[in-house]
């Protein structure tokens, strides 16, 4: 059922689903002997204890109850969170015949998911630039479900990929390269004093209207960002070419020479208002010497479904890659033959869901171990998932 968290007559702003306690299930247990009957009861109780331990200590395998409806090809499962087996009154009357009656009480997840995965997108090549988007339609099921991502190196050589940023746009409907905002170049021959505005990136009224007050990770791709300078993004509203006011600013970041930077989460437009004018991001910097800053782009990456994966050290071979299972929260690197898994990956933040009944636009952006961002890198991406539903 839905947990109501708003006031009566108001908006339920934090509605969520609660776990389900099913009606007690009556069951008969039959053994080949009284000893076999006792062993079957103990085996079932051991399984239910494993479910309890899984919830309390987050260790051991998950335990599921499975369902297959008459005439349906697929089997569905729901994870057991707590359960108790009780013998009914007079249950021992049947004991001499190696049989008994029992009642099974189960609390489970609020959803059923398929025991087999479905494919949202078979292996598709994307490029690490404005062509980094996959369109996923026809997602099965009723409610959102975690994505399972298989991202493979398709560059003809081993690459030391480091950060993977993945986002899913289901609300804003960016088309073409609207998720990208152009950057620019700024050369400085003397130190830059505190909070100098050096580069402007304009978000058009059309794109700002599509953002509709949503929250976005602002990912900046640089072809030149010298180490040792301090940079931050600031958000201004403008009419024509004139800035009217600063609306927000982000965290100040010390550059280590990396060329792909997460400037944090921004509401665009601030306050959730429809944009009556465009908005601009300004890069401000503090530097002690001379140099050149070249910002290639800012990418608007929806923050609600945002995933950051980090590869500690592994040179991913050609054909090898990274696998993320959003359902189990497992991540690992894998060889080209898919025969060996390596614990080199770290889940830094977030996750990505897929949404039935909507167009899902998945973005993947990555850099490399030296901090380099290379916009010609190619990745083969496969997206699968387990469809989820609430009842039948």
Language-model segments: residues:
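Extended extracellular/luminal ectodomain segments enriched in beta-structured repeat modules
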Residues: 20-22, 141-146, 207-219, 228-230, ...
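Exposed aromatic-hydrophobic patches
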Residues: 134-137, 201-205, 219, 258-270, ...
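Extracellular carbohydrate recognition and processing domains
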Residues: 240-275
